[in-house]
């Protein structure tokens, strides 16, 4: 605008010079032509008249000839002067120039305009830089949103995995319950078998006692029969002559003896208990026979009785052998009964332990259920988040739905495969049970029961080992939970500390807003005082006395400002007293005190400038009466410019406050999201640790199952050597066991792979947590920097708003200052030099205080480092060097 006006003025001056030159040239040509024409005519109508009159008439003719030219020149000059006046009006309305000779004022005005344009360009550059920074922050926020979406997808996958593992845990629990029921049934069977064994043992003991008594009686009878045999041999030798008579008698008594033998044999076939009675009868008969022998003293009877006793003796020897075998068997049964009792007792103790462990496992399953509930709640939360994300983009939701469907299909397929595997295992179990039953039928009941009890003991021992390992892992998990809780508490403390810092920053912002409102009120007050000054300028002659009153009012205002200074000094003293109690707020209070000191210095500068202006006004009253008209125009222009500048500044402040509020809201949202993400990641990390431990426990269980299967295989091989008949069935069972071993080894490998994947996921989550922590630190530093920059921009805007009217006043008052510069040049220059020195001293004091605080307070170095870097214009490399040198 101003450049165009200056160019327009130059063009007008050039055109004026050209027009004057052309007019003079045309007049010269006109006069020469007229004279030549008159000379050519030779004779004129005035020759008859006297020469004096002719000369006068010729002069009149010349005047008449020149009159239109002069008239045209006058008109042109008048038009040019009107144009110059219009130009002067425009310049006087838009610039502090009041006359054509005010070249220096025009130069000063254009220089001020150039400075203002430079300041505007700098502000535009600053705003563009801030805009670029905000765009970068928006890009980073978009990237963080994309990363969150990726994290959501990964979290959904992890939740799907957790649901699968939950189903597997449920199936394992069902298997454990089934195994428990089987163990209980086996215990009951073992108890029943033990009871049967006890009854058999008691029966065998009773039978053994009876057999002992019978053996003793038979031994006595044997001794007697041996004695009888010796006597019978002697009698047979004596009675060799009387055989004929002896043959007739035994033939008559043989049927009775045979009848007795038949009765004895029948008694043996019926019951073993009656055998003792018959033996007692035979012993009684023998005694009767012995009593008869001396009475009858017949040789035939003795021979018959000897033969009968031989037969009885042989029978008794056979029965003795059978009874000795039965005694050995009964002793073997007694030992087996004792072993079975001991095993039953051990089984009962192991059953008690297994029950306790099952209770613990049930409790663990309940905890797993609780974790599954939490996982379900997290799934619900994730679904809610997905619903929220549905508003943002339907494509992503469809993709997530497709992925969920795929995961569900995969889950269903895996469940189907697991069910098939369970069915296969159940079939294998049934086949093994049938094989075991066949082996039980083939082998003796007691041996099968003992083998069962041994297998159960091994199983219970393995389960005991597994449960002890689980307890150890549970203790380790408790320790890890305690450590994680400690870390969580520490992180919560850091979050609370950051929230307190945010609150402090909010309070500072409120105070800054209050200060901004105070500055606005001060601006309005200064505007009112400016209006009053304008009114006083219009009535300067009549209001000299009022001017003195204004002096007094300014003195009163100075007193008020001094009172305010005292109040602020008291506040500063109170803040210094509070410094010992609140070390964290020292930097903020210092900044506030420095701002207040700067405000006080600005106020003192204003007071000094006002006093100088009043002194100048007292000397320049007469000149201002002449320049009142021009000053009115200048004041109107200043008003309009001030209003426009104030509006622009208010718009800038509003835009900056809006941007700051937006940034603050975005940062708060980002911080909340990041805190939520960190908590979610911690929870997922804990869940993954629990899952890893569960998988390790599964690996251990599978290893124990493999060992059990190997033990079973070895036992089956041992039994195969003893039981040759069931070798084919044992081979089938061995094959099945080998297949189950292969499947279990495959499961072990799969579990190891899944364990490694979970470990890698855990490492990735830890890396993500570190990245989030670094981002959190970067965002906090950016927030501090943005707040510091906003406070600095406010301070600069305030100083600009306060300096702009003074600069306008200086430009407006430039004509009168030029007129006075000859009278008072030295004080003005000295005041400007003093103000510059004061500002430089203030800046140096501020930098000194910041550096001293940075060096003294180690805890606040992280907060003061961005301020020091902005003051000293340090790069990141310089900051690192500074920190390393301080360490």
Swiss-Prot record:
Task: Report how it sits in the membrane.
Answer: Peripheral membrane protein
Composition bias, Low complexity? 788-807
Q: Which GO terms describe its cellular component?
A: cytosol; Golgi membrane
Basic residues bias: start-end ranges: 258-273
GO BP: Golgi to plasma membrane protein transport; response to endoplasmic reticulum stress
Chief place of localization: cytoplasm
The residues covered by the GRIP domain are: 837-885
Keywords in alphabetical order, please: Coiled coil, Cytoplasm, Golgi apparatus, Membrane, Protein transport, Transport
Region (Disordered) location:
16-50, 142-214, 240-301, 783-822
Asked whether the keyword NADP is assigned, the reply is: no
Bias (Polar residues) occurs at 240-254, 808-822
Q: Does the keyword Transport apply?
A: yes
Localization per Swiss-Prot or TrEMBL: Cytoplasm; Golgi apparatus membrane
Q: PROSITE patterns, per this entry?
A: GRIP
List where Basic and acidic residues composition bias occurs: 37-50, 145-210
Residue ranges the record marks as coiled coil? 118-241, 299-788
Q: Which InterPro entries does the UniProt entry name for this protein?
A: Golgi-autophagy_related (IPR051952), GRIP_dom (IPR000237)
- Domain remark in the UniProt entry: The GRIP domain may serve as a Golgi targeting domain.
* Protein task: Involved in vesicular transport between an endosomal compartment and the Golgi apparatus.
Q: What is this protein called?
A: Golgin IMH1
Source species taxonomy: Eukaryota, Fungi, Dikarya, Ascomycota, Saccharomycotina
């Amino acid at each position: 605008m101003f450049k165009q006006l200056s160019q327009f003025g130059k063009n007008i001056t050039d055109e004026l010079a050209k027009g004057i030159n052309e007019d003079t040239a045309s007049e010269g040509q006109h006069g020469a032509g007229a004279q030549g024409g008159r000379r050519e005519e030779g004779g004129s109508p005035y020759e008859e008249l006297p020469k004096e009159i002719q000369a006068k008439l010729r002069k009149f003719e010349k005047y008449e000839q020149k009159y239109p030219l002069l008239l045209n020149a006058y008109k042109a000059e008048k038009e040019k002067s009107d144009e110059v006046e219009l130009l002067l009006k425009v310049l006087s309305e838009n610039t502090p120039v009041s006359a054509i000779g005010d070249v220096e004022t025009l130069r000063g005005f254009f220089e001020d305009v150039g400075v203002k344009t430079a300041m505007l360009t700098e502000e535009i550059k600053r705003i563009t830089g801030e805009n670029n920074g905000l765009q970068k922050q928006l890009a980073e926020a978009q990237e963080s949103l994309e990363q969150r979406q990726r994290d959501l997808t990964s979290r959904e996958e992890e939740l799907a995995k957790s649901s699968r593992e939950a189903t597997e845990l449920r199936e394992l629990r069902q298997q454990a319950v089934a195994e428990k029921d089987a163990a209980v049934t086996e215990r009951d069977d073992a108890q029943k078998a033990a009871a049967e064994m006890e009854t058999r043992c008691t029966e065998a003991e009773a039978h053994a006692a009876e057999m002992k008594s019978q053996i003793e009686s038979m031994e006595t009878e044997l001794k007697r029969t041996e004695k009888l045999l010796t006597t019978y041999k002697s009698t047979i030798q004596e009675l060799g002559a009387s055989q004929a008579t002896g043959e007739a008698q035994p033939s008559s008594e043989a049927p009775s003896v045979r009848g007795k033998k038949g009765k004895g044999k029948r008694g043996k076939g019926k019951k073993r208990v009656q055998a003792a009675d018959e033996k007692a009868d035979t012993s009684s008969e023998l005694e009767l026979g012995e009593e008869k022998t001396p009475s009858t003293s017949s040789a035939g009877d003795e021979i018959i009785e000897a033969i009968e006793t031989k037969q009885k003796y042989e029978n008794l020897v056979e029965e003795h052998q059978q009874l000795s075998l039965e005694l050995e068997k009964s002793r073997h049964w007694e030992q087996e009964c004792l072993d079975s009792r001991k095993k039953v007792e051990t089984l009962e103790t192991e059953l008690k332990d297994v029950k306790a462990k099952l209770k613990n496992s049930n409790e663990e399953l309940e905890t797993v259920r609780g974790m599954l509930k939490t996982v379900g709640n997290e799934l619900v939360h994730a679904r809610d988040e997905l619903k929220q994300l549905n508003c943002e983009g339907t494509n992503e939701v469809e993709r997530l739905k497709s992925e969920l469907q795929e995961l569900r299909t995969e889950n269903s397929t895996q469940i189907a495969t697991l069910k098939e595997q369970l069915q296969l295992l159940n079939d294998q179990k049934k086949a093994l049970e049938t094989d075991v039953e066949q082996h039980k039928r083939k082998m003796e009941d007691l041996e099968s029961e003992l083998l069962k009890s041994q297998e159960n003991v091994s199983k219970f021992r393995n389960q005991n080992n597994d449960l002890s390992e689980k307890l150890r892992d549970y203790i380790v998990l408790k320790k890890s939970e305690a450590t994680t809780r400690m870390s969580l508490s520490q992180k919560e403390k850091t979050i609370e500390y950051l929230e307190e810092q945010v609150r402090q920053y909010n309070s500072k912002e409120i105070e800054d807003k209050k200060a901004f409102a105070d500055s606005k009120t001060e601006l309005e007050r200064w505007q009112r005082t400016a209006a009053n000054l304008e009114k006083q300028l219009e009535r300067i002659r009549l209001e000299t006395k009022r001017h003195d009153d204004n002096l007094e009012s300014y003195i009163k205002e100075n007193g008020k400002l001094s009172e305010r200074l005292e109040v602020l000094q008291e506040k500063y003293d109170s803040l210094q007293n509070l410094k010992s109690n609140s070390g964290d707020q020292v930097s903020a209070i210092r900044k506030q005190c420095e701002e207040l000191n700067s405000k006080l210095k600005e106020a003192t500068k204003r007071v000094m400038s006002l006093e100088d202006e009043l002194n100048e006004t007292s000397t320049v009253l007469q000149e201002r009466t002449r320049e009142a008209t021009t000053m009115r125009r200048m004041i109107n222009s200043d008003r309009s410019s001030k209003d426009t500048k104030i509006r622009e500044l208010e718009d800038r402040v509003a835009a900056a406050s809006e941007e700051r509020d937006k940034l603050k809201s975005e940062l708060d949202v980002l911080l909340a999201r990041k805190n939520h993400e960190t908590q979610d990641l911690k929870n997922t990390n804990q869940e993954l640790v629990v899952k890893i431990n569960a998988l390790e426990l599964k690996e251990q269980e599978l290893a124990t199952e493999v060992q059990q299967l190997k033990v079973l295989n070895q036992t089956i091989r041992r039994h195969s050597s003893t039981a040759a008949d069931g070798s084919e069935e044992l081979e089938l069972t061995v094959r099945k066991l080998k297949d189950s071993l292969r499947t279990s080894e495959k499961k072990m490998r799969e579990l190891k792979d899944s364990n490694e994947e979970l470990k890698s996921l855990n490492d990735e989550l830890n890396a993500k947590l570190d990245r989030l922590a670094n981002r959190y630190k970067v965002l906090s530093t950016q927030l501090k920097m943005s707040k510091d920059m906003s406070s600095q921009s406010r301070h600069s805007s305030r100083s600009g708003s306060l300096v702009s009217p003074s600069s306008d006043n200086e430009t407006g008052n430039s004509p009168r200052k030029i007129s006075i510069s000859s009278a008072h040049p030295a004080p003005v220059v000295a005041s400007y030099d003093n103000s510059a020195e004061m500002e430089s001293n203030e800046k140096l004091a501020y930098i000194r205080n910041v550096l001293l605080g940075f060096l003294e307070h180690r805890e606040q170095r992280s907060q003061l480092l961005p301020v020091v870097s902005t003051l000293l214009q340090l790069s990141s490399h310089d900051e690192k060097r500074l920190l390393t040198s301080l360490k």
